[in-house]
């Protein structure tokens, strides 16, 4: 979550008049994240999240995102719900941006995830994949291989400012992935951004998943590779195979993977590492000064990519033999 667009109290109260939210007591911007402008509201009827959609989020995609949250919630997955306006619409407009009110989900994200949390995330991810079956809408992944190839030229010229030799390294990796990327794996709706700050816990119990604004249709195993990258590396850059095994075991307890999915894990992990390297690099080079947003260091994902380049089989991630 982040703030790119400021709002004022007068406009906010006019916006809230279209909802049955009670009286506004306070609001403040939320700095975490990189995609939309988010605010925590307190009203006489409770806490809410206000999201203004901008940057990579296309207005035409919003029915998919908001509808998916409704679908998953109806299937029993704990996730935020978009609140309808008095006219039944899920979207309004504030400060020139499409905007929605989202229910507040209890819990906090973990700054130091441990092994048991990784297992819980694996279980929750597989549960989400199964719960999303039957969702009627479709959204192609804008950040798939073709998306990386399109984004890279926007950062390529200045890449070596961030790390000498980075331009040539990413050039070579894109060539490799173009030749090795799987063509036919089990697919469905994926979260595509299930980082620790998008998973809430109450104590050691997972209380819900948030931030579905990268959700799309793609390989289900690719979503697991994103989570292995996001949850199973230590601060020193080393891969924690105990955490990886716990996450994989948690996932497999809910949904089994085909032999083709297992065999593809090393290249999928390379791809997901490159995806976040590229978007972080682009944001690092282009985020406006003064934006209330936490820019994320791109080279963390270069180190992860280099690890995956040396992996030969899924067993090195903790896959059961």
From Swiss-Prot:
A Gene Ontology molecular function term of the record: ATP binding
Biological process terms from the Gene Ontology for this record are: threonine biosynthetic process
Task: Give the EC class as a word.
Answer: transferase
> Which reaction(s) does its UniProt entry say it catalyses?
L-homoserine + ATP = O-phospho-L-homoserine + ADP + H(+)
Q: Which UniProt keywords apply?
A: Amino-acid biosynthesis, ATP-binding, Kinase, Nucleotide-binding, Threonine biosynthesis, Transferase
The answer, when asked if Glycoprotein is one of the entry's keywords, is: no
**Transferase listed as a keyword:** yes
For this protein, the Enzyme Commission number is: 2.7.1.39
Q: Copy the pathway line from the protein's UniProt record.
A: Amino-acid biosynthesis; L-threonine biosynthesis; L-threonine from L-aspartate: step 4/5
Give the record's family classification.
Answer: Belongs to the pseudomonas-type ThrB family.
Q: What is this protein called?
A: Homoserine kinase
The encoding gene: thrB
